[in-house]
Amino acid sequence: GLVGALFAGGLSVAEVIAYPTWSWDCVWYHLTQSRLIVQEGTIHYWFGPADGSGPLIYANGYPRLVETFTAFHLLVLRSEALVSAGQLGWGLVGAGVVVAWGRRLGIPRPTALLLGAGFLLVPAVFLQLHTTHADVATGSQTLALAYLVFAPKVSRAVFVAAVAVAGGLVA
């Protein structure tokens, strides 16, 4: 399990480095938003004219979190070398949350680690980890939200911090 997860992660990193974004929806939906963020100089590009004549209005109905990470890569590197890396970190978050769920449910640490590694081997995760899709990020965030919501006791400070982070990601 752990060797497979390392292989999956390594292969995804290699694909991010070696190949450009190529799938149709990555290029026409997700990468378009990232480029608009850079072109317009703001993440609020979707607030165009009321008549809908803003740039590429069709891109306005899609998630923006991974696209914002991709725009960050474009701005910092001034290249498209890592535009497909926007979900790699979210894959690790998802694996970590699976480990945390396992520990909360009383599963021994080594088994919980294997389950977390197994998260990276789920076909929907493995096949999209190196793309600009938003599915791995959304799945990881959903697992993390459920972990917090169903916590036996959550301190007020942790709850307020989680709401602040979620609000910052949505804004």
Roles of regions detected by a PLM:
Residues 104-106, 145-159:
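Membrane-interface transmembrane helices that cradle and orient dolichyl/undecaprenyl
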Residues 66, 70-77, 83-97, 109, ...:
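Transmembrane alpha-helices of multi-pass, membrane-embedded glycan-processing enzymes
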Residues 1-12:
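Start-transfer (signal-anchor) and selected internal transmembrane alpha helices
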Residues 127-137:
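Short acidic/glycine- and proline-prone juxtamembrane loop motifs at membrane-interface regions
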Residues 17, 76, 105, 121, ...:
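Transmembrane helix irregularities
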Residues 115-120, 149, 157-171:
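Membrane-interface alpha helices of multi-pass inner-membrane proteins
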Residues 19-33, 39-69, 78-81:
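Extracytoplasmic catalytic/substrate-binding loops of multi-pass membrane glycan-assembly enzymes
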Residues 81-82, 98-121, 140:
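Transmembrane-helix signature of polytopic, membrane-embedded enzymes
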